[in-house]
């Protein structure tokens, strides 16, 4: 009820609302009803979003996704939608990628990276709650994974440390231009030419912006 009231109030005040409807097994029966409500309320855009969550941290397919809260406790278990029209096509392509390259890791090692935030028409940066400047939410999101007792086991910290640690990429300490001067953005971009993740290619870039496997983009098709 609160969400509905807030959305209606936002639209009534002149807001341009967009509703991204994540489709899981438990919610796919309500897609048409939600789309009708969006029209009735004056939502500018209703997106049937085909989630790409059904890949684990090792890039293996899974049929369910266990949602957890910020303390790591299990919440609702999410399952793939049943209807093919609601499924993310990139997940279906995963078998083809594996046959071609041998494994998803072999694909990531060889993947051509086309950055989603440094393209010709789209340029953006991501500033974390700590005031740290990163290329995107995906690179920033690798900094603190709740399942690591030591967050610095993640590869992204190699680039952060090379830039002077957290202070080196802090907008509060250096300003945004100063963070760019630290070299972290160029170092990440240069890494895409390396032969493998083991040799220094930033893996999260290959996973999220590799040109042949893109669950993110397929969510919106």
Where are these regions (language model features)?
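Radical SAM enzyme [4Fe-4S]-AdoMet core and its adjacent flexible, acidic
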Residues: 1-171
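Flexible mid-to-C-terminal extensions adjoining Fe-S/redox cofactors in radical SAM and related proteins
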Residues: 132-133, 137-221
């Amino acid at each position: 009820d609160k969400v509905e009231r807030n959305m209606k109030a936002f639209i009534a005040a002149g807001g341009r609302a967009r509703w991204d409807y994540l489709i899981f097994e438990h919610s796919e029966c309500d897609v048409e009803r939600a789309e009708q409500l969006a029209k009735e309320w004056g939502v500018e855009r209703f997106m049937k979003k085909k989630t790409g969550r059904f890949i684990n941290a090792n890039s293996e397919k899974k049929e369910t996704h266990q949602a957890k809260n910020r303390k790591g406790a299990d919440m609702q278990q999410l399952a793939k939608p049943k209807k093919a029209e609601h499924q993310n096509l990139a997940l279906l392509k995963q078998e083809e990628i594996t046959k071609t390259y041998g494994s998803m890791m072999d694909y990531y090692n060889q993947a051509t990276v086309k950055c989603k935030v440094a393209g010709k028409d789209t340029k953006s940066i991501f500033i974390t709650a700590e005031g740290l400047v990163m290329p995107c939410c995906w690179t920033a999101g690798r900094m603190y994974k709740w399942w690591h007792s030591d967050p610095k086991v993640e590869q992204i910290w190699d680039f952060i440390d090379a830039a002077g640690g957290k202070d080196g990429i802090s907008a509060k300490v250096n300003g945004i231009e100063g963070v760019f001067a630290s070299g972290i953005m160029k170092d990440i971009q240069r890494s895409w030419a390396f032969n493998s993740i083991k040799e220094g290619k930033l893996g999260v870039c290959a996973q999220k912006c590799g040109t042949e496997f893109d669950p993110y983009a397929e969510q919106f098709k």
